[in-house]
Design a protein with these regions (language model features):
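P-loop NTPase Walker
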Residues: 1-132
Length: 134
């Protein structure tokens, strides 16, 4: 799935991208939408989020980890908990458990937490295709 957000500065792109990332990380796509994945093992390895600047990439990573932590602790300060509960049609304790598992996976495998810049992404592609590109 490819998801593109185009908008001007200050319009909430990062907020929306963090929500979409969490929905993909914690959910499973079905014909009718998303349902909660109660075993989100290594889902972070299957997601690539790309932005323009290193600052934006670091901010996105920070917000994703913060939100996972808030949801895992069932904090009322989460920006996305209610929206995720509604999107998945699930109970808070189930979302909390999935967030705990996903947070542990992300933190223990941070090098595969793929939020990067466009430049970094293409550098990786070119490095991996160097032989074929000549």
């Amino acid at each position: 799935m490819l998801l593109i957000h185009k908008a001007s500065a200050g319009s909430g792109k990062t907020y929306n991208l963090v929500f979409e990332y969490l929905k993909i990380l914690l959910g499973k796509k079905t014909e009718s939408g998303y349902i909660l994945d109660e075993h989100p093992n290594d889902n972070h390895k299957k997601i690539l989020a790309i932005t323009f600047t290193n600052k934006a990439a670091q901010e996105m990573k920070k917000r994703i980890v913060k939100e996972l932590d808030l949801i895992a602790r069932n904090s009322k300060n989460s920006d996305h908990s209610e929206s995720l509960l509604k999107a998945f049609g699930t109970q808070p304790n189930k979302l909390q458990d999935s967030a705990k598992k996903a947070l542990t996976d992300v933190l223990f495998d941070y090098s595969n937490f793929n939020v990067s810049t466009i430049d970094s992404f293409f550098q990786t592609v070119m490095r991996n295709l160097a032989r074929e590109l000549g």
